[in-house]
């Protein structure tokens, strides 16, 4: 088992959640949510986080419907975001199915903090945690 550091993003047009995890443990922790305008974040803020954590790989959640079919509007924007991450920072970037990650994130947050924990930023970051932990599970098959 590798000891790579992996960063994940839960892409959204208004907010992009992030998380960090270690492949050796298969666990992830929330980082921060970045405000975005139509899916475009402040790239300087993203760069600071990438420089701070120096991930070996970045995972971006791929929005799909319940059947795994790509969505017309948001899926291409998430792919564009992933391509821009790779182009700007040179990191290897993988897309990973994010089906139901927000539902699971909301349930996790509510369990530990009630309604007060359900802020948009918290949900987006916890969604990134769910995406990353799901990616870890998919690697261990």
UniProtKB/Swiss-Prot annotation:
Keywords: Cytoplasm, Hydrolase, Nuclease, Ribosome biogenesis. InterPro entries: RNaseH-like_sf, YqgF, YqgF/RNaseH-like_dom, YqgF/RNaseH-like_dom_sf. It is an enzyme of class 3 (hydrolase). It comes from the Bacteria. CDD domains: YqgF. GO terms for cellular component: cytosol. Its main location: cytoplasm. It is found in: Cytoplasm. One of its GO terms (biological process) is rRNA 5'-end processing. The keyword Cytoplasm applies. Gene3D superfamilies: YqgF/RNase H-like domain. GO terms for molecular function: nuclease activity. Belongs to the YqgF nuclease family. This is Putative pre-16S rRNA nuclease. It comes from Aliivibrio salmonicida (strain LFI1238) (Vibrio salmonicida (strain LFI1238)).
